[in-house]
C-alpha cells in the first residue's frame, strides 16, 4: 500500500487545513523522511504490512505530476494507492473512504486523476469543517486549525489509522461500512 497525503510544501502551509494529508502522514511517522525529486517518502508497518507514505512536493494543484514517479519508485499499481486529502464539504470529525470517484472540486485530486487517466483511485477525504459565511474559500483552506479543532483532528487521525488497518486486512468495502458513518467529537 502507498498512502499519498496531499498538501503544500514549506513552512507557510505546514499546519493549514489544506495540508491535512501531509499532517496525517506526519501523525503516522514524523521523522526520517527521505526526498526524491517530486516527493518525500517514508515507510511504516501497519497490521503486519509495510506501507509507504508519500508527500508530493509539487504543490497541491500539481500533485498529479508526482504520481507516475511514485508508481515507478515503489513498483506500485493504481490499486496500491490511497490518496488522503481535505474536503471542505465534510464536517470536521468526519471522513469518507471511497474506491473511486470524481475530484469533487479538489484541484489536487483533479491533477492526480488527469495524470493517471482514471477516477478509479482509492481515497480518504478528511472533513476540515464548515467555511464561515462570507469567508473566502482560499483563506479558509489556507487557515490553521484552532486548538479545539486540533483535539478533534488528532482523534480523526487515530480513526484513519484504524481504517487503513481495516483496508489492509479486510478490504476497503469493510472500512467504508465501518468508518463512513462515524463522527469524531471532543
Curated annotation (Swiss-Prot):
<dbReference type="GO" id="GO:0005737">
    <property type="term" value="C:cytoplasm"/>
</dbReference>
<keyword id="KW-0963">Cytoplasm</keyword>
<dbReference type="GO" id="GO:0004045">
    <property type="term" value="F:peptidyl-tRNA hydrolase activity"/>
</dbReference>
<keyword id="KW-0694">RNA-binding</keyword>
<feature type="active site" description="Proton acceptor">
    <location>
        <position position="18"/>
    </location>
</feature>
<protein>
    <recommendedName>
        <fullName>Peptidyl-tRNA hydrolase</fullName>
        <ecNumber>3.1.1.29</ecNumber>
    </recommendedName>
</protein>
<comment type="subunit">
    <text>Monomer.</text>
</comment>
<comment type="function">
    <text>Hydrolyzes ribosome-free peptidyl-tRNAs (with 1 or more amino acids incorporated), which drop off the ribosome during protein synthesis, or as a result of ribosome stalling.</text>
</comment>
<dbReference type="InterPro" id="IPR001328">
    <property type="entry name" value="Pept_tRNA_hydro"/>
</dbReference>
<feature type="binding site">
    <location>
        <position position="61"/>
    </location>
    <ligand>
        <name>tRNA</name>
    </ligand>
</feature>
<keyword id="KW-0820">tRNA-binding</keyword>
<keyword id="KW-0378">Hydrolase</keyword>
<dbReference type="GO" id="GO:0006515">
    <property type="term" value="P:protein quality control for misfolded or incompletely synthesized proteins"/>
</dbReference>
<feature type="site" description="Discriminates between blocked and unblocked aminoacyl-tRNA">
    <location>
        <position position="8"/>
    </location>
</feature>
<dbReference type="GO" id="GO:0000049">
    <property type="term" value="F:tRNA binding"/>
</dbReference>
<comment type="function">
    <text>Catalyzes the release of premature peptidyl moieties from peptidyl-tRNA molecules trapped in stalled 50S ribosomal subunits, and thus maintains levels of free tRNAs and 50S ribosomes.</text>
</comment>
<feature type="site" description="Stabilizes the basic form of H active site to accept a proton">
    <location>
        <position position="86"/>
    </location>
</feature>
<feature type="binding site">
    <location>
        <position position="107"/>
    </location>
    <ligand>
        <name>tRNA</name>
    </ligand>
</feature>
<feature type="binding site">
    <location>
        <position position="59"/>
    </location>
    <ligand>
        <name>tRNA</name>
    </ligand>
</feature>
<feature type="binding site">
    <location>
        <position position="13"/>
    </location>
    <ligand>
        <name>tRNA</name>
    </ligand>
</feature>
<dbReference type="Pfam" id="PF01195">
    <property type="entry name" value="Pept_tRNA_hydro"/>
</dbReference>
<dbReference type="InterPro" id="IPR036416">
    <property type="entry name" value="Pept_tRNA_hydro_sf"/>
</dbReference>
<comment type="similarity">
    <text>Belongs to the PTH family.</text>
</comment>
<dbReference type="GO" id="GO:0072344">
    <property type="term" value="P:rescue of stalled ribosome"/>
</dbReference>
<dbReference type="InterPro" id="IPR018171">
    <property type="entry name" value="Pept_tRNA_hydro_CS"/>
</dbReference>
